[in-house]
Amino acid sequence: MAITNADNAFGLRAIGKVGQNRDNQGLSEYGIAASSAAIYQNDPIMMAATGKIIVGTAAAVLLGSLNGVFFTDATTEKPTYANHLNASNTATDIVGFVSDDPYERFEIQSDAALTAAEVGLNADIVYAAGATPNYVSKVELDHSDLKTAIAQLRVIGISKDPQNNAAGVANVNAVVI
């Protein structure tokens, strides 16, 4: 029977820190503009020129990954916490919780077969919008972009997830910084 990896992209999932420092999984708070584009859990985040955060794009400087949002619902006026932000949200107090520690390690699915020999290379992301009902990111590591030059992510290992750790097989999960 051939070894396969589950094809289940999930964006940049924080999994711990590099080295022996404290791993408190702390999140920083950043403002998000009303009626912003949809942002899903684990989407890569970047800072816009407005000082608000938005979904990261390929080749942009990434701030971290979204862990959730808080806002006062414009219709019900109730405080609301969610793992994502709908594009149609008109709240004026939206705050995003971002895993942004520079020592944070993330797990991300590769969009092709990543081999152990490619650990240490750099690559950008390839964006795909998240989906309902879970509102989790579908962003993946752009395998075709692997290089020694500067990029958004550096591959530092292959995941230990038993459903996605078969190196050299499509959809393997990589550990990145």
Where are these regions (language model features)?
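Surface-exposed, low-hydrophobicity beta-strand/loop segments enriched in small/polar/acidic residues
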Residues: M1-I177
